[in-house]
C-alpha cells in the first residue's frame, strides 16, 4: 500500500516521490543510478528523523489519526494466536466499534478488547468510525466478566475519537454504560493492561482503560476532548485546534510526566503506519514485560495496587501562604 503523507510531511513526500521515480527509471535503463537513490534515501531518512524529533502536539494528533495506522485487529493478528471473537452485549445488539474475544498471548490464554475504526467507507460506517454506543461498552464489560471468571488477563487497545453522542445512544444509557465500566474495571479480580494505540478520546477511551498498567504508543493521544472540540468551545473556531492541542497536554510524553500513564512504547521512524510489523514487535515486548509484572500476584494484592494507583490521581498538597 502506498504511504499517505500528512500535510506537514510534504518535504518527505517529495523526496520519496523522487526516489520512486528514479527506481522506475533504473528498471528501464542501463545507467546505474543506485548511488543517487541511496543518497536520496538517506536524506529522506534524516529528514524524517529531524521532523519527528520536533513534532507539535497538533502534529502528533494528526499522526494518531493516520488512516493507515494499525488498528486493534491488526495488532490481534500480529500479537495473538487462537483469537476467537465474541459478539453482543446479551441485551440489545453487537456494536462493531468494539471488538473482543479469547486469544493466546505468548502461549497464555487471555481476553482481548479494543476499539476498531475500519479502513474503507463501508467498514467505517459499520464500525461507526470507532465511536462505541452503550451496547459496545456493555459487550466489553461482559467479556471482562468472562475473563474474571476464568482468571484470564485482559489486554485492551484504545483508539476512539470518543463515545457516540447520538440520541439513540443517550436513550440507551451511554453515560451509565461508561460509568459502570469504570466501576467494574476498578474492582476486577484479574490483571488489566491497557494500551492507547491511536486516539484516546475522553470517556469513550477511559471506559476500557482503567487498568493496572496504562501504556501509550509514542505518537498516540489521550485527552478529555479533541483539539477541534476544545477550540470550538474556547475560541469559537476549530481553526484554533493547534493551540488547543498544546493546552490539552495530550501527548504521551506530557501524560507520562504528569504520572497519568505508566509507559511509552516507542514507534518506528515515521510512525507505526510506516512499519506495522516493527511496531507490533515493540509492543509485544512491552505487553510481555507488563504481564510478567502481575503473574503470581494475589488477587488482594492486585486490587489493592490498582486502588492505590487510582487514588493517587489528582492528589494535591495544601501549603500555608508565605508571609
UniProtKB/Swiss-Prot annotation:
GO terms for biological process: fatty acid biosynthetic process; malonyl-CoA biosynthetic process. Pathway: Lipid metabolism; malonyl-CoA biosynthesis; malonyl-CoA from acetyl-CoA: step 1/1. It comes from the Bacteria. Its EC number is 2.1.3.15. Residues 39-293 form the CoA carboxyltransferase C-terminal domain. It is found in: Cytoplasm. Coiled coil: none annotated. GO terms for molecular function: acetyl-CoA carboxylase activity; ATP binding; carboxyl- or carbamoyltransferase activity. It catalyses: N(6)-carboxybiotinyl-L-lysyl-[protein] + acetyl-CoA = N(6)-biotinyl-L-lysyl-[protein] + malonyl-CoA. InterPro entries: Acetyl_CoA_COase_a_su, ClpP/crotonase-like_dom_sf, COA_CT_C. PROSITE patterns: COA_CT_CTER. Keywords: ATP-binding, Cytoplasm, Fatty acid biosynthesis, Fatty acid metabolism, Lipid biosynthesis, Lipid metabolism, Nucleotide-binding, Transferase. Its main location: cytoplasm. One of its GO terms (cellular component) is acetyl-CoA carboxylase complex. The keyword Manganese does not apply. Pfam families: ACCA (PF03255). Acetyl-CoA carboxylase is a heterohexamer composed of biotin carboxyl carrier protein (AccB), biotin carboxylase (AccC) and two subunits each of ACCase subunit alpha (AccA) and ACCase subunit beta (AccD). Component of the acetyl coenzyme A carboxylase (ACC) complex. First, biotin carboxylase catalyzes the carboxylation of biotin on its carrier protein (BCCP) and then the CO(2) group is transferred by the carboxyltransferase to acetyl-CoA to form malonyl-CoA. Belongs to the AccA family. This is Acetyl-coenzyme A carboxylase carboxyl transferase subunit alpha. It comes from Burkholderia mallei (strain ATCC 23344). The gene is accA.
